């Protein structure tokens, strides 16, 4: 099997390089009541009073976006956002493995700089 065939096989097997997993236990009704409703209301109300508390009560302090429009992907050129996703996932894995930072790929279907900047600005409340 060639390196290219092996890479395709592994990417198909993995079906993506990253996943989202829970950091809190959800084994009992009490766990659910604390992590979701009604307990989730308390940090929401505190953050509503002071948005900086979102860094304390959420994963925002350790979550970054890896953003691309797919126009300049690792020497592959303009391959588009969907085709750039494997590279963005790979970058997210590097953030986690070598820096302990949770990263999430955002692949935008636009080459318009203003649209990209606006999209990132609109998403900023989710990332640190």
Walk through the language-model features, giving the residues of each.
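N-terminal ligand-binding/catalytic initiation module
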Residues: 1-128
